[in-house]
Amino acid sequence: MEGRGGSRGGAMARGGGRGGFGGGRGGFGGGDRGGRGGGRGGFGGGDRGGRGGFGGGRGGRGGFGGGDRGGRGGARGGRGGARGGKPAAGGKPGAKVIVEKHPRHEGVFIVRGKEESLATLNSVPGESVYGEKRVSVGEGEDKKEYRIWNPFRSKIAAGLHRGVDEIHIKPGSKVLYIGAASGTTISHVSDIVGPTGVVYGIELSHRPGRDLIGMAKKRTNVIPIIEDARHPQKYRMLIGMVDVVFADVAQPNQAQIVAQNSAYFLKNEGHFIISIKASCIDSTAPTEVVVQNEITKLKKEKLRPQHLLKTLDPYERNHSLVIGVYRKFGSSEK
């Protein structure tokens, strides 16, 4: 079904071209492959990205420790496309789009028009957080507004574009987000978890912390906490048990930070997602060695990696994404 519109985003990175949904999917240790093409990389430098379609080719699935390359490419459109309507504020009249539910990630949508993008249903219609484009569909009481999720501004969105299978964040989820910054990604997580979920955002720096607090004033399911994530005991009375811990702190002791916060707040069999920037941990060692060392540290803390996305290129340079499960009462894996 068709809709119209899409407001013009003012805060996109300069030179931030479009990466595709053709990213391959590898198992733990498998080689993920990016999309095809030559879109320029934004935010973070001059990587050249891939411009792929949503219907990327299928490849073999790599298992934990396997070396198979490939995997399924971009997401295929599912049922439940949104109805057509008027353009969002600032949108171009006549720009037809189709909004569909993502087939694998609940609470995430695919917007198809001149460009193909991921989006979340805006829980604060009429408001953008970081200048992102917005698309409105439907009429009257059926009108809905979607916010385009920019993969050059969000590690989770980059992972979704690269074909990650599961982020474990869905409507009703309780999420602890370590390294919240000004709230760009948290705002989309807020959209996904909805009114029955909650997002706790930990940020140490006061300047982005002010932006985070300002965003949270309009999103009642976001709880900003301006504190040092290395000392979770300082905010233990503010946070309940959570389903997912996400960490994007780029610190040498990142694995320890995740382990400490998981011990306090992550429920047994809950999940974690860690964005690893190898150069921030050890700039002298090869990226693969640094990532494997971090994985070893996580295993010793009962954090069992299940999926490794070796690269987030072209969206984020020198970043990997590790997703796994917390076995609180199991023995540590050496």
UniProtKB/Swiss-Prot annotation:
Pfam families: Fibrillarin. SMART domains: Fibrillarin. S-adenosyl-L-methionine-dependent methyltransferase that has the ability to methylate both RNAs and proteins. Involved in pre-rRNA processing. Utilizes the methyl donor S-adenosyl-L-methionine to catalyze the site-specific 2'-hydroxyl methylation of ribose moieties in pre-ribosomal RNA. Site specificity is provided by a guide RNA that base pairs with the substrate. Methylation occurs at a characteristic distance from the sequence involved in base pairing with the guide RNA. Component of box C/D small nucleolar ribonucleoprotein (snoRNP) particles. It is associated with the U3, U8 and U13 small nuclear RNAs. Part of the small subunit (SSU) processome, composed of more than 70 proteins and the RNA chaperone small nucleolar RNA (snoRNA) U3. Residues 1-93 have a biased composition (Gly residues). This is rRNA 2'-O-methyltransferase fibrillarin. One of its GO terms (cellular component) is nucleolus. GO terms for molecular function: histone H2AQ104 methyltransferase activity; RNA binding; rRNA methyltransferase activity. Residues 1-94 are annotated as: Disordered. It comes from the Eukaryota. It catalyses: L-glutaminyl-[histone H2A] + S-adenosyl-L-methionine = N(5)-methyl-L-glutaminyl-[histone H2A] + S-adenosyl-L-homocysteine + H(+). By homology to other fibrillarins, some or all of the N-terminal domain arginines are modified to asymmetric dimethylarginine (DMA). Keywords: Methylation, Methyltransferase, Nucleus, Ribonucleoprotein, RNA-binding, rRNA processing, S-adenosyl-L-methionine, Transferase. Its EC number is 2.1.1.-. It comes from Dictyostelium discoideum. S-adenosyl-L-methionine binds at T184, T185, E203, L204, D228, A229, D248, V249, A250, Q251. It is found in: Nucleus, Nucleolus. GO terms for biological process: box C/D sno(s)RNA 3'-end processing; ribosomal small subunit biogenesis; rRNA methylation; sno(s)RNA metabolic process. Belongs to the methyltransferase superfamily. Fibrillarin family.
